A protein has these predicted regions:
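Conserved protein kinase catalytic-loop anchor
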Residues: 184
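Hydrophobic residues within beta-strands of alpha/beta enzymes
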Residues: 39, 187-189
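Acidic/aromatic-lined carbohydrate-recognition and catalytic surfaces
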Residues: 1-177, 181, 194-244
Length: 244
């Protein structure tokens, strides 16, 4: 039996109005009595929280609102004592615009880190294509001081990561394995179907009065996501027999 916990509203133990890891630890016995085997945590990574923590600015850090890495390690240890498993949300289609990678990309739009994302030149003063983000408005946001745009299928503060770049994939795999080495049992993978893009970024027939077309149309028509997922599995989850 798996149970999802939204840490922000679960249990606040320090009186700041925000639920925390200490609150989850304190309720493990109760959760065990309910028959829960797996606890799935919504995002607890460092984040500006533009999108409830699904905009991650540091994959290796716990948001201070929720506690510390030491408390997270304690949660893993206490759960293990009770034969319970901890899994977390894994958000790797995109990151936060405050992430170090994206900040470096903005500083040098023609450099190495720009290829961690999708930077494209506009078309005749317009965005590279007429894709609409899942949150509304264009999927493309101007890169300040350039004639380029960056792709975001969700909020503009959530630039999409370029899964065609093997160096980017390697960095993500390293991060995933780091958490699994800690003793995390696995991940619930967020928005993963979106990682494969049509690199030509064609226009689609508009489906609304804004002249844009839902970005899901590109996702539906492009092939290759299965190969990317197999590569992800091979280099991470498979080695640890992780839940996904």
């Amino acid at each position: 039996v798996a149970y999802q916990i939204y840490p922000k509203s679960f249990l606040d133990t320090n009186g700041d109005g925000i639920g925390d890891l200490r609150g989850i630890i304190s309720k493990l016995d109760y959760l065990k009595k309910l028959g829960i085997d797996i606890i799935w945590l919504s995002p607890i990574y460092k984040s500006p929280f533009v999108d409830q923590g699904y905009d991650i600015s540091d994959y290796y850090a716990i948001a201070e609102e929720f506690g510390t890495m030491e408390e997270f390690d304690e949660l893993l240890s206490e759960a293990k004592k009770r034969d319970m498993y901890i899994i977390m949300d894994l958000v790797i289609n995109h990151c936060s615009d405050q992430h170090e990678w994206f900040q470096k990309a903005l500083a040098d739009p023609d450099g190495e880190y720009a290829d961690y994302f999708y930077f494209r030149k506009g078309r005749n003063g317009n965005p590279p294509s007429n894709l609409r983000s899942y949150f509304g408005g264009s999927c493309w946001e101007p890169v300040p001081g350039t004639d380029k745009y960056y792709l975001h299928m969700f909020a503009k503060e959530q630039p999409d990561l370029n899964w065609e770049n093997p160096l980017l994939r390697e960095k993500l795999y390293e991060m995933i394995n780091w958490w699994l080495e800690k003793g995390l049992a696995g991940f619930r993978i967020d928005a993963i179907i979106n990682i494969k893009k049509d690199l030509d970024f064609p226009d689609f027939k508009p489906d609304g009065p804004d002249g844009l077309a839902g970005c899901w149309k590109m996702v539906d028509e492009v092939d290759g996501v299965g190969e990317l997922l197999e590569d992800l599995k091979k280099h991470t989850f498979q080695k640890y027999e992780a839940f996904t």
